[in-house]
């Protein structure tokens, strides 16, 4: 085990005592109370992990002392020797739990997310695959108790989506979906293929943390807002009022378009929310890319041009190329049932990279 500096743990315990005292004396103003309460809530979990780790450490030290004691009672030494493996395992688990809780936190992990799926190479088959991916994430979200709301969609001519953008609302959505960003590839025999040949097509997925107004400031003077009539598949107008909204952020060139609601006011609110999320994500991506380059991270780099996963239908196989994980559970993954197996493996690898970067591996 890589030692965790005791002075670092002592500093956390001291800070916990200070925050507790500041909240107890009642002198803090309302704003400070909110911040201190949030900090205390975060520190409580860390302090519990520290106490658990130190208790396990002391327990193992006591057992080792009993075994090594010259002239000690043979029966007690034998009993201690029996207890030693279990105590070592308990310390290992407490050490691992403490390491993970000390890792730098991604402030966006607790947020809801914006999910964008776009058909890539492969024509109609790519659009169908984009639709399959959207259903996979929708089913996964349902299993987690999250809510999915489509912001904008452009249907493919043979079904599926050329593009679909949705909000996924719930606690810690981004922490689970953020590793899905990238290029997804499918290998299967299309229904229209008479020779039984396998075709390859692709779709790209982008997952953004849903930004709130406090996360990023958007200057109204930097916006170009256009209204227009909503359009359906094929480009025809589907209503007579100009309810669709397109907002262009002039400094960055970021454009968002929303037409799902009949109300222009609601579409504008959704478009602003989507724009904030895109601008917030651009800031995060720049910072994350620099950090990822420093540690040569394979997981969580956020590179959306990277081919991250292949879905091979003839073999019933899903392969995540970042961690060389292969599951022969294609149907279960596409149904959202086994997606956690992939995501859990990605989270574990990401944590290992962070531990190495922090010198705690």
From Swiss-Prot:
InterPro entries: PCRF, Pep_chain_release_fac_I, Pep_chain_release_fac_I_sf, Prokaryotic/Mito_RF, RF-1
Post-translational modification remark: Methylated by PrmC. Methylation increases the termination efficiency of RF1.
Record SUPFAM superfamilies: Release factor (SSF75620)
Compartments reported by the entry: Cytoplasm
Keyword terms of this UniProt record: Cytoplasm, Methylation, Protein biosynthesis
Basic and acidic residues: bias regions: 285-309
Region feature (Disordered): 285-311
GO cellular component: cytoplasm
Modified positions (N5-methylglutamine) in chain numbering: 236
Keyword field contains Cytoplasm: yes
An MF annotation (GO) of this entry: translation release factor activity, codon specific
PROSITE patterns per UniProt: RF_PROK_I
Cystine bridges: none
Family: Belongs to the prokaryotic/mitochondrial release factor family.
Role: Peptide chain release factor 1 directs the termination of translation in response to the peptide chain termination codons UAG and UAA.
Record protein name field: Peptide chain release factor 1
Organism of provenance: Methylorubrum extorquens (strain PA1)
Gene name tied to this protein: prfA
């Amino acid at each position: 085990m890589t030692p965790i500096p005791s002075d670092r743990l002592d500093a956390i315990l001291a800070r916990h005592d200070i925050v507790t005292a500041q909240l107890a004396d009642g002198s803090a103003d309302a704003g400070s109370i909110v911040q201190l309460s949030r900090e205390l809530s975060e520190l409580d979990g860390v302090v519990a992990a520290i106490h658990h780790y130190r208790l396990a450490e002391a327990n193992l030290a006591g057992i080792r002392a009993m075994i090594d004691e010259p002239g000690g009672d043979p029966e007690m030494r034998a009993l201690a020797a029996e207890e030693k493996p279990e105590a070592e395992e308990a310390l290992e688990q407490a050490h691992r739990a403490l390491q993970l809780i000390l890792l730098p936190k991604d402030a966006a992990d607790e947020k809801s997310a914006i999910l964008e799926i776009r058909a890539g190479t492969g024509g109609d088959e790519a659009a169908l695959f984009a639709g399959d991916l959207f259903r996979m994430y929708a089913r996964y979200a349902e299993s987690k108790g999250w809510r999915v709301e489509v912001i904008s969609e452009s249907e493919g001519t043979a079904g599926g989506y050329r593009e679909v953008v949705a909000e996924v609302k719930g606690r810690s959505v981004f922490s689970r979906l953020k590793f899905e960003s990238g290029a997804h590839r499918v290998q299967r025999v299309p229904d229209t293929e008479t020779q039984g040949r396998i075709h390859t097509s692709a779709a790209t997925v982008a997952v953004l943390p849903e930004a709130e107004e406090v996360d990023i400031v958007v200057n109204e003077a930097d916006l170009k807002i256009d209204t227009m009539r909503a359009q359906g598949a094929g480009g025809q107008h589907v209503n007579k009022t100009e309810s669709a909204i397109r907002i262009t952020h002039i400094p960055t060139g970021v454009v968002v378009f929303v037409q799902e609601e009949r109300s222009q006011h609601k579409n504008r609110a959704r478009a602003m929310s989507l724009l904030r999320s895109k601008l917030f994500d651009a800031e995060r991506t720049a910072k994350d890319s620099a950090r990822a380059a420093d540690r040569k991270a394979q997981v969580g780099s956020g590179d959306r041009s990277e081919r991250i996963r292949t879905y091979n239908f003839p073999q019933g196989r899903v392969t995540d190329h970042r961690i060389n994980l292969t599951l022969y559970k294609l149907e279960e993954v596409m149904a959202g049932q086994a997606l956690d197996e992939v995501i859990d493996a990605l989270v574990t690898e990401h944590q290992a990279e962070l531990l190495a970067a922090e010198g705690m591996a």
